[in-house]
Every structure is written in C-alpha cells, then in structure tokens.
C-alpha cells in the first residue's frame, strides 16, 4: 500500500503516513 511522506496532507486518511503521525492534518515525522 502507498503511504504519505512527512509534510503530506493527511486530513482524509490519517493512518497512511510513512513512519509519521497525522497532526493538524499533516504527516509529521516522529524522528528528530
């Protein structure tokens, strides 16, 4: 399955972020 890169809009599909979490409608990377 495809997944979204960090910074991608995820408002409609919050579970598809690659190694990231959907926050404020955008994928935010969990690694800093």
Swiss-Prot record:
Its main location: secreted. Disulfide bonds join 3-18, 10-22, 17-27. GO terms for cellular component: extracellular region; host cell presynaptic membrane. It comes from the Eukaryota. The keyword Disulfide bond applies. The modification 4-hydroxyproline is found at residues 6, 14. The presence of a 'disulfide through disulfide knot' structurally defines this protein as a knottin. The cysteine framework is VI/VII (C-C-CC-C-C). Delta-conotoxins bind to site 6 of voltage-gated sodium channels (Nav) and inhibit the inactivation process. This toxin acts on Nav1.4/SCN4A and Nav1.6/SCN8A (EC(50)=2.3 uM). This is Delta-conotoxin-like CnVIB.
């Amino acid at each position: 399955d495809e997944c979204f890169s960090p910074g991608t809009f995820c408002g409609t599909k919050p579970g598809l972020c690659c190694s990231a979490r959907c926050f404020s409608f955008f994928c935010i990377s969990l690694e800093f």
